[in-house]
């Protein structure tokens, strides 16, 4: 019984990895059908549906992976790092680095891969970005408690500016067909971003 569960989990992972790879390829710039995905995995469409009730559920699973990866790592940064500027830098670099290492998933983060899918999937991505923005806002607000002084600029504005930078770099990555990596020149860009944190 345990072997059967492991085999089923492995097949599910194989399907999700194939979907992510298709999103990374030129196929990702078009609607991905279950027929194309089944051919990529080397199974029938019926076999796909034995593991996932719908393509939407496949995207749900990829979004869960994105959420778990980013939120878990953000929480680790907040636990390990106490300096506000370092926290913000690490969170921004985490988001950009995750996108760079996972180009297919970046198409999901930017909404590009979800254009032809159910609206609620885009809603989940919107919620993820709202959670990240709330985390950034909290880090900015905690500066006053941790370091004795806050920012002159409203923390809401600063948090949205940081997130807009991340979203812009991820969109540029997708638009360029993954030519312009989000972390390129980050060490030169960060001082420009940090200068806005007044």
UniProtKB/Swiss-Prot annotation:
Q: State where it is primarily located.
A: cytoplasm
The UniProt entry's coiled-coil ranges are: 117-144
Domain of life (superkingdom): Bacteria
Transmembrane regions: none
Look up the DNA-binding region in the UniProt entry and give its residue ranges: 33-52
Which Gene Ontology terms describe the biological processes this protein takes part in? cell division; negative regulation of division septum assembly
**GO-annotated molecular function:** DNA-binding transcription factor activity; transcription cis-regulatory region binding
- Any Pfam family: SlmA-like_C
Q: Which GO terms describe its cellular component?
A: bacterial nucleoid; cytoplasm
Ordered alphabetically, the record's keywords are:
Cell cycle, Cell division, Coiled coil, Cytoplasm, DNA-binding
Q: What NCBIfam families has UniProt attached to this entry?
A: PRK09480.1 (NF007015)
- What PANTHER family does the annotation carry? HTH-TYPE TRANSCRIPTIONAL REGULATOR RUTR, NUCLEOID OCCLUSION FACTOR SLMA
Subunit structure, interactors included: Homodimer. Interacts with FtsZ.
**What functional role does this protein have?**
Required for nucleoid occlusion (NO) phenomenon, which prevents Z-ring formation and cell division over the nucleoid. Acts as a DNA-associated cell division inhibitor that binds simultaneously chromosomal DNA and FtsZ, and disrupts the assembly of FtsZ polymers. SlmA-DNA-binding sequences (SBS) are dispersed on non-Ter regions of the chromosome, preventing FtsZ polymerization at these regions.
Its recorded name reads: Nucleoid occlusion factor SlmA
